[in-house]
Amino acid sequence: QYYYADLELPAAEYEIRDALHKLRDFGQTDGFFEISVLNCELLPALAEVRLDSPTLDEMNFFAKRLEALNEEEQLVFRAVSRRILPKNPEGELVSMKDLINCTYGLDQVMIASNVGSDEQLGQFVIDNDLHEDVASIPDNALYLLDKKQIGKLQRESDGGVFVDGHYVVTGDYTMPEIYDGKTFPDEAPTEWFAFRLEVAEAPVNSADETAGSAEWISLPIDKKEA
């Protein structure tokens, strides 16, 4: 019999512990947990693939990395992650190490906005003189050019892909090995607490009287901060 607990990532340490405690309360005490992705808004394909023995810590770190990406980096990630995800969901396992490392170096990839097809890319190439042969053609003859074919050749040369109306030049992207599969890169520590209390001055008549002075505190707390 299987027991499971849903956990939305990234999660705080106490949330992860609560999820694990739920499994143990149901009798799942052998230390073996199978982890699968139910939904990933940024990369829906993750719900269809098989991950190569991911740990909960890896999944949480990966979720933190995705959450930290800006809009352009998200577009690039969706483009370059296609190298990692198999075309056949039933195929090879997907490495968590590669997924994590694929969230780095994204700011080095060129993006062209409002370019979502080969024809639009061809026009972009013409307008910006990106190809020497095209740039040498007189302006009065540009209308004769096959924009779609020019865009197709440029895309194939760049190894580029279209993502949500953007052209992402992924051919020059080299995935850095920031995560070695054992030790996570340095990151800012997150606050841990067993529980939180909202503390305020004692009211005289109504609780609303002191609502403005209320503050949240996390327990346990260091004596110096108390």
Task: Provide a role label for each language-model segment.
Residues 1-226:
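Long, charge-dense low-complexity segments
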